[in-house]
Swiss-Prot record:
The gene is vpu. Residues 1-4 are extracellular. Keywords: AIDS, Apoptosis, Host membrane, Host-virus interaction, Inhibition of host innate immune response by virus, Inhibition of host tetherin by virus, Ion channel, Ion transport, Membrane, Phosphoprotein, Transmembrane, Transmembrane helix, Transport, Viral immunoevasion. It comes from Human immunodeficiency virus type 1 group N (isolate YBF106). Residues 26-74 are cytoplasmic. This is Protein Vpu. HIV-1 lineages are divided in three main groups, M (for Major), O (for Outlier), and N (for New, or Non-M, Non-O). The vast majority of strains found worldwide belong to the group M. Group O seems to be endemic to and largely confined to Cameroon and neighboring countries in West Central Africa, where these viruses represent a small minority of HIV-1 strains. The group N is represented by a limited number of isolates from Cameroonian persons. The group M is further subdivided in 9 clades or subtypes (A to D, F to H, J and K). The lineage of its organism: Viruses, Riboviria, Pararnavirae, Artverviricota, Revtraviricetes.
């Protein structure tokens, strides 16, 4: 009967690990989206101030939105 308890404990640990991995992936996704939104806002602010877009921030945004980054979200 003791071995049944160990099996149940092992299954519970595996399920908990899977849940934490999924939560971590969602957390990273949300943080990346926040970073993208901050860069977009910075570009908008600079555009309003100067009347032109900042190339450095636009380039950084393009890197963040590259297809290889989007593949990691799925």
């Amino acid at each position: 009967m003791l071995w049944l308890g160990f099996i149940a404990l092992g299954v519970a640990i595996i399920i908990a690990a899977i849940i934490w991995v999924l939560l971590y992936k969602e957390y990273k996704k949300i943080k990346l989206q926040e970073k993208i939104e901050q860069i977009r806002q910075k570009i908008r602010d600079r555009t309003e101030d100067r009347g032109k877009e900042s190339d450095g921030d636009a380039e950084w945004l393009a890197i963040l939105l590259s297809p290889d980054k989007l593949d990691n979200w799925v």
